[in-house]
C-alpha cells in the first residue's frame, strides 16, 4: 500500500493547504486515517533551531541540522506510524525540499553544493524512508512571488524576499527535481482543477 506520501515544494507553494484537502478526503472515505507530519524544520527544539539558522549560518551547519532533525523525525514519528496499515502519513517536506535548496544555493554562489547522494545513501541503509509517492506543489513562479510578498516574517521567507534571484533558482531546481520521474505527481496549486486532479491521482495510488 502507498502509505507514505511526501509533499515537496518551495515556501508558499501550497503544500500544507493541499495536504489538508487530501487529509479531509482520505478521512471522509473512512478506510484509512490520514496523519499530517511536518518534515524539514520539525516542531522539536532542534527543528526550531534549524529554522532559525536557515539562511543565516553556512551550509555545512545547515545540512547537519537538517539531516539530524530528519533522521530523528523518521525514527520517532514516521516509522512508528507506518507500522499501522490503516494510517497514511502525509509528509509536508522530506529530503527533496532541502537538498534542492542547498543545490540551488550552490548555483547561486557558483559553488558545487550538490548533496543528492546523501539521502539516497540514507534510504539505502534504512535510515530514511523512500516515499511511496512524491507530490510536488508547483504553481507558476509569479503566483509564489505574490504569495511570498504577503507572507509572514521569518528567517527563510525574509531571505527569499531579500534575494529574489536565489528564490527563482530554488524554484527552478524543484521543477527539475519534480520532472526527474514520471511517477511524480505535479500539482499547480493556483488551479482548482489541477489540485482536484492531483488529489484524485493520489487517492487512486493509495488503493494500489
Model-identified regions with their sequence ranges:
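A glycine- and Lys/Arg-enriched "phosphate-lid" helix/loop adjacent to the NTP-binding pocket
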Residues: 98-173
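NTP-dependent small-molecule kinase module
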Residues: 23-25, 142-208
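Hydrophobic anchor at the beta1->P-loop junction of P-loop NTPases
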Residues: 7
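Walker A/P-loop
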Residues: 16
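ATP-binding Walker
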Residues: 12-13
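ATP-dependent small-molecule kinase phosphotransfer cores
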Residues: 37-117
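Post-Walker A helix-loop "phosphate-sensing" segment adjacent to the P-loop in P-loop NTPases
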Residues: 24-34
